[in-house]
Amino acid sequence: MHKQPLSPFTKQQLLPQEETLEIFKKKGELFIGIPKETAYQEKRICLTPDAVYALVNNGHRVLIESGAGNGANFSDKDYSEAGAEITKDTAKVFSCPMILKVEPPTLEQIKLINPQTILISALQIKTQTKKYFAALASKRVTALAFEFIRDTDGSYPAVKSLSEIAGTASVLIASELLSETKNGNGIMFGNISGVPPIEVVILGAGTVGEFAARSALGLGAGVKVFDNSITKLRCIQTQLGRPLFTSTIQPKNLLKALKRCDVVIGAVRGTNRSPIVVSDTMVRAMKKGAIIIDVSIDMGGCFETSDVTTHRQPTYIKHNVVHYCVPNIPARYPRTATVSISNIFTPYLLKIAEDGGIENSLRFDKGLKNGLYFYHGILTSKSVGEWFDLKHSDINLLIF
């Protein structure tokens, strides 16, 4: 007689099965120190009160030096209400396990840093010396340069964001300088019925060039863009969504455009230095009272007549042409620049904590790893090593 099965399941189904469990990463708790910027005319701060609130709500601590946000119009009270701790003790801020700065720390500030600290700031490789890297190495610091942090699409979010500000600002500054109150030609930067529009020449079709063109076109100016990359010129037309005068940098065409224009914006980048695109002779041929805004002055400038100026004394006149050659244009708008930088920093900080610390984040995020130039006191950036003739190691051999 055939026995009835006691279970509706097959013999195979009744065998013990492997259970797949989700492996939870242990979240890290961040203790972030934000010192007051001491660099000349630097008014920005890395995090807004809203960003601090988001971090504190996620269980992190933020210690801010008193007055750090004043330049960007964020008071100590704003940060305190967001959950930050405020101190007047600079050394206490620099003793935090993680330090956020806009400008790279000075040699005196590095002395205040504890060993094995994580430093996130700009690197500004062109302004550094071997002493800076030796000081970081002696403290066994893990350092990230935010201008080298790469996004998933291959772009550099911090550089792009600040370039957008610089591009838009260059047009607003030119508009101000053209007005009679600033000893300009008394011309309005706009499209007024019956009045010929302003002629603007933009050198360089990168992010700065794109946003300068966008702003100038929005104000009704006639815009001509020059760049030696056909791909970039094609791209700027697509981004702006309208036909535009574009040309490669040919001296004859450029001189013709310079003679007629009211404003020239220089935004040409080079590998080590910006190439000089506009010669002294070309500047002499320009209109009296025309405006030169050299955005690429931080890399040497692309006008032969360019000399570095400051936010306090931003202009000088040479060959009857007004020159504006301030290296750090976004610092003119510290609050906007702060919000922009903060929007980039905050997701990265939350992700670092979620991954269980900087080590794991560097392991999983190639873009963040690209910004690393020191790992526990070992130089990992090839470009820094070659620039300063320093020994460097491949980060992929240190983190795997």
PLM regions with names:
Residues 126-153, 281-325:
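Rossmann-fold NAD(P)-binding glycine/threonine-rich loop
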Residues 147-173, 177-188, 302-400:
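Adenosine-phosphate binding glycine-rich loop
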Residues 52, 76, 110, 133, ...:
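Generic hydrophobic/aromatic pocket-lining and core-packing "Φ" positions
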Residues 1-31, 37, 107-198, 326:
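Glycine/serine-rich phosphate-binding loop and adjoining beta1-alpha1 elements at the start
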Residues 91-107, 241, 245-277, 291:
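Rossmann-like NAD(P)-binding element
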Residues 35-36, 40-69, 181-266:
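Glycine-rich phosphate/diphosphate-binding loop of Rossmann-like nucleotide-binding domains
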Residues 16-135, 139:
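An N-terminal-biased, well-structured beta-alpha scaffold segment characteristic
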